[in-house]
Structures are given as structure tokens and as C-alpha cells.
């Protein structure tokens, strides 16, 4: 009932707004469409808005894709000018497109991800907005006649949605990785390195199979986390060469129909110049339109990073469990109250947030994998959902890494007293006796100590396996940590 009531209220609200708003008539090949007079978009955007009412605000096309369309249309205007497009038209298209890049026209891009799988409506959204804004820049007034600047003939000149959308996918992902993700992971890595060095002298008990194992230093444990993050950064960077290949110039099916020779090379060069990233034309446009293996590869690398961060965050929160009845080897920063019923309780919230992010990224990767596998013949038609999920994963990992660094990692402290207590209570120190009394006797001593709840030393002395001096000499945790840093 509540849902139905809200829906009715929304409908009444929209009806009221319509009554207050003036509309103009726009026309496309399907006929007349009414468009809000305050909007720059045209008939095709309006049809998409009405035909794909799916998901609402939360499912709108990511702004990075919108901004990437601005980059692409600006660069296309510059290149088309070289190939004969009227200079005044080209220059004003470029100016309008630059406003898209700068975010000045964000409210003119209302479409959701769940539309045509080629992203055609979003491409036309960009074409319509840029053409109408370009006319306004030329004349000083709004004119929706399309006579001075046409969305298809001018803004979309030498282009197809089938090559513009995948090009924008690559631009958006590459910029996001370079400007947001890599710096965030490098920040996390630096903080982890600091902790590794800080903890290098602290000898603790290791754990395998969730059971006590032989000693290592806390710094060595953190060095493993550092290497996971370092490899993750490298994996992400290793995907970039394929992302820098742009589909633009393939037009409808990859043949380059209706584009001048050299257009593909020139526009990739212009995009590279504008972004400062080494974009180049894709060597095979058929692959660039029909498959999105490069995006699947990126998503796979993001998934691997999520797997690493899940392990790291879980280890840290388990090592910080307590404060009285857990492992308690790490003291985590206390950022906020943890319970509405248990006074004084504090939880490892940054670790929990990170692990939830990792779970989401793993889910995103499943979506991208399925979508990437659905390239049929000359075109993959899952493009919008692929880029939505890739950008979501990039943003989530980047934001979570910064948050985890600032509010958790930099403030982690070691409880050296607790660590030393657990170290000397561990029966796995018996491993150091193997070379002196043999595996079988060492195992017998460990089992006796565990069963009788005595120390390992007491068990060895009781069994006559070692003297007190021999035990102290042979069972020295500082000699059991190896030379690995």
C-alpha cells in the first residue's frame, strides 16, 4: 500500500510539474516528441527517458562516461575541422563539448545505464545537448531547429554509437585508473610499508590453517600485505595498454564506413593530447566493437585487488579481535561507538567497510564477465552495464583504500606484551627441536604439554628429551624467523 501511495504521489508531482513547465515539439524519424523547453536535449534523449524508466537516479549513466563523451566530441570536432567541417561550427561544437567535460552540463544527461546495449541513446544525448548548446554559443540564444548545428551531421560526423561508446568506455576507465585508483592504492601501500618497518623487530607466532605455527615478525607478516598491494597496482597498470586502444573510426561494424582515411589515427592522437594519456587507434576495429576483452581484463585485475584487500582487511581485524577475549595482537584505531546496546563496544568498522567493498567488486566482476561474453557477431550490446560496473569497482576500491589508510592503517599499533605472551605459549616452538631430538619426540613433547596444560619446556624436561640449558639454547624464537625481510 505504501509503495502504491508513493507511486501515486510521484505521478501527481510529475503531472503538476508538467503543468508548470513549457514544452517544445521535437521531431525524429518516429515523429513528434514533447521536450522540456529548459533542456538542451532533443527527441532521441526524450524517447529514451520515457522508454527506459529503469532504476531511477542510482542507475544513471556514470558522469565519467558523460565527461568522456565531452572529450570525444571535442576532439572529433577538431579533427573534423581538419577534414572539412565548417570552422565556426567545429569551434562551437568544441566549446560546447568542453563545457560537458567541465561538468557544466551534467544536468542535461538524464539517461540510465539500462538502455540500448550499444549506448546509442547516450551518444545521441551528447550529440543533441552539444549541438543545441553550440547553436546558443554561436547566436546568443536558444534555437532548437538543428539548422546551424545538427546533432548527427555535425556533432556525430564520421562517428557511430558503435565506436563512440566503446571509445568513451576506454577513456573513462583509463582516466579513472590513472587519476583515482593508482594514487589511492599507492597511498595504502606507503602506509603499509611504514607499518612493516615499524613492526620488523616484533617476533610473533605465525598461524596456518587457523592454528598455531612457527614464529615470524609482525613486519614480515605486513610485508606480505605490501607485496599483495604492490602486485595489485602492477596488475592494474598492466591492463592499460589495451585500454589505450580506441575503437573510434570503426563506425558501424568496424570497417570505417563514412570516415575519411586517417580519421581514426588523428582522433586518437587528439584524445591523447587532451588527456595526457597515450591513447592510440585500435589495431583491429572489429575486435574493438564486437568484444570488450580489455574491459573484462581490467575488471579481472580489479577483482584480484579486491581478493587481496579482503584477505588483508580480514587479517587485520582478526589480529585486532578482543579487546579481552580475542587475539588482541593489534590495537586498531577507535573511530566511533560500535553498539546501540553494548556500552563501550568498538568495532573494526574500516575493515568491515573494506570487506563489503571487496564483495561488491567481486559481484561487479561477475556482471562484467557475463556482459563481456555476450558480444554477438559484430557488436557487443552490453556496453553500458560493463562500464558502469568497471567504474563502480574503480571508485569503490579507490575510496575504500583512502578511507582504510586514513582511519585504520596509519593508526594501527602492536600490543607487544600480548604478542610475546602468545608467542611463548605456543606449542609450535617445538619445531625448533626437530634437528636435535627428531620429529617424533618433538611431537610427543608438544602433545604432552597440550594435554597436561604445561609449558613445552616442562614437557621436554619431564620426558628427558632436553636439559634446561639445551632447551633454552635450541628453542629461541629470534633464531626461527629466517632471513626473509
From Swiss-Prot:
What pathway is this protein a component of? Carbohydrate metabolism; tricarboxylic acid cycle; (S)-malate from fumarate: step 1/1
Instruction: Answer whether the UniProt record assigns the keyword Lyase to this protein.
Output: yes
Could you name the domain of life of the organism this protein comes from?
A: Eukaryota
PANTHER family registered for this protein in UniProt:
ASPARTATEAMMONIA/ARGININOSUCCINATE/ADENYLOSUCCINATE LYASE (PTHR11444), FUMARATE HYDRATASE, MITOCHONDRIAL (PTHR11444:SF1)
Role? Catalyzes the reversible stereospecific interconversion of fumarate to L-malate.
Active site residues of this protein:
209, 339
Annotated residues for binding of substrate: 118-120, 150-153, 160-162, 208, 340, 345-347
Other remarks on record? Answer: There are 2 substrate-binding sites: the catalytic A site, and the non-catalytic B site that may play a role in the transfer of substrate or product between the active site and the solvent. Alternatively, the B site may bind allosteric effectors.
Q: How does it assemble?
A: Homotetramer.
The entry assigns this protein to a family as follows: Belongs to the class-II fumarase/aspartase family. Fumarase subfamily.
Q: By what name is this protein known?
A: Fumarate hydratase, mitochondrial
Against Pfam families, the record matches this protein to: FumaraseC_C, Lyase_1
> Single GO molecular-function term?
fumarate hydratase activity
Any single GO BP term: tricarboxylic acid cycle
Q: Which reaction does it catalyse?
A: (S)-malate = fumarate + H2O
Q: What is its EC number?
A: 4.2.1.2
* Database matches in InterPro entries: Fum_hydII (IPR005677), Fumarase/histidase_N (IPR024083), Fumarase_C_C (IPR018951), Fumarate_lyase_CS (IPR020557), Fumarate_lyase_fam (IPR000362), Fumarate_lyase_N (IPR022761), L-Aspartase-like (IPR008948)
Xref: NCBIfam families: fumC_II (TIGR00979), PRK12273.1 (NF008909)
Organism, per UniProt? Dictyostelium discoideum (Social amoeba)
Query: What is the uppermost EC class here?
Result: lyase
Q: Which GO terms describe its cellular component?
A: cytoplasm; mitochondrion; phagocytic vesicle
Q: Hey, what's the signal peptide range on this chain? A: none
Location of the transit peptide in the chain: 1-19
- Site (Important for catalytic activity) at 352
Amino acid at each position: 500500500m505504501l509503495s502504491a501511495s508513493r507511486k501515486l504521489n510521484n505521478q501527481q508531482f510529475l503531472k503538476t510539474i508538467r503543468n508548470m513547465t513549457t514544452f517544445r515539439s521535437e521531431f525524429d524519424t518516429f515523429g513528434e516528441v514533447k521536450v522540456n523547453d529548459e533542456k538542451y536535449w532533443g527527441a532521441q534523449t526524450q524517447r529514451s527517458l520515457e522508454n527506459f524508466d529503469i532504476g531511477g537516479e542510482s542507475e544513471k549513466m556514470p558522469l565519467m562516461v558523460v565527461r568522456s563523451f565531452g572529450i570525444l566530441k571535442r576532439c572529433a570536432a577538431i579533427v573534423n575541422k581538419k577534414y572539412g567541417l565548417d570552422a565556426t561550427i567545429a569551434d562551437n561544437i568544441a566549446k560546447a563539448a568542453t563545457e560537458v567535460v567541465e561538468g557544466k552540463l551534467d544536468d542535461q544527461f538524464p539517461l540510465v545505464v539500462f538502455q540500448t546495449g550499444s549506448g546509442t541513446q547516450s551518444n545521441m544525448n551528447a550529440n543533441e545537448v552539444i549541438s543545441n548548446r553550440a547553436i546558443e554559443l554561436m547566436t546568443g540564444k536558444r534555437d532548437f531547429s538543428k539548422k546551424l548545428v545538427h546533432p548527427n551531421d555535425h556533432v556525430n560526423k564520421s562517428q557511430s554509437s558503435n565506436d563512440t561508446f566503446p571509445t568513451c568506455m576506454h577513456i573513462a576507465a583509463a582516466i579513472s585508473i590513472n587519476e583515482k585508483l593508482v594514487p589511492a592504492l599507492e597511498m595504502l601501500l606507503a602506509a603499509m610499508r611504514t607499518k612493516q618497518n615499524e613492526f620488523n623487530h616484533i617476533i610473533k607466532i605465525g598461524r596456518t590453517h587457523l592454528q598455531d605455527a612457527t614464529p615470524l615478525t609482525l613486519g614480515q607478516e605486513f610485508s606480505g600485505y605490501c607485496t599483495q598491494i604492490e602486485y595489485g597496482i602492477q596488475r592494474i597498470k598492466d591492463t592499460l595498454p589495451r585500454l589505450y586502444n580506441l575503437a573510434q573510426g570503426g563506425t558501424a561494424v568496424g570497417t570505417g564506413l563514412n570516415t575519411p582515411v586517417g580519421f581514426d589515427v588523428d582522433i586518437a592522437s587528439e584524445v591523447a593530447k587532451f588527456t595526457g594519456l597515450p591513447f592510440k587507434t585500435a589495431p583491429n576495429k572489429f575486435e574493438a566493437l564486437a568484444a570488450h576483452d580489455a574491459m573484462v581484463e581490467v575488471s579481472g585485475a580489479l577483482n584480484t585487488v579486491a581478493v587481496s584487500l579482503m584477505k588483508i582487511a580480514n587479517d587485520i581485524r582478526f589480529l585486532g579481535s578482543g579487546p579481552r577475549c580475542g587475539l588482541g595482537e593489534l590495537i586498531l584505531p577507535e573511530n566511533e561507538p560500535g553498539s546501540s546496546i553494548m556500552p563501550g563496544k568498538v568495532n573494526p568498522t574500516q575493515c568491515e567497510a573494506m570487506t563489503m567493498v571487496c564483495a561488491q567488486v567481486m559481484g561487479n566482476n561477475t556482471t562484467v564477465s557475463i556482459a563481456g561474453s555476450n558480444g554477438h557477431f559484430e557488436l557487443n550490446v552490453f556496453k553500458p552495464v560493463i562500464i558502469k560496473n568497471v567504474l563502480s569497482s574503480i571508485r569503490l576500491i579507490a575510496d575504500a583504500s583512502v578511507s582504510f589508510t586514513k582511519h585504520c592503517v596509519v593508526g594501527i599499533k602492536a600490543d607487544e606484551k600480548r604478542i610475546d605472551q602468545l608467542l611463548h605459549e605456543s606449542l609450535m616452538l617445538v619445531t625448533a627441536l626437530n634437528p636435535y631430538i627428531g620429529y617424533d619426540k618433538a611431537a610427543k613433547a608438544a602433545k604432552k604439554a597440550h594435554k597436561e596444560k604445561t609449558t613445552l619446556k616442562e614437557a621436554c624436561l619431564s620426558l628427558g628429551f632436553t636439559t634446561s640449558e639445551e632447551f633454552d639454547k635450541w628453542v629461541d624464537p629470534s633464531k626461527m624467523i629466517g632471513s626473509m625481510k
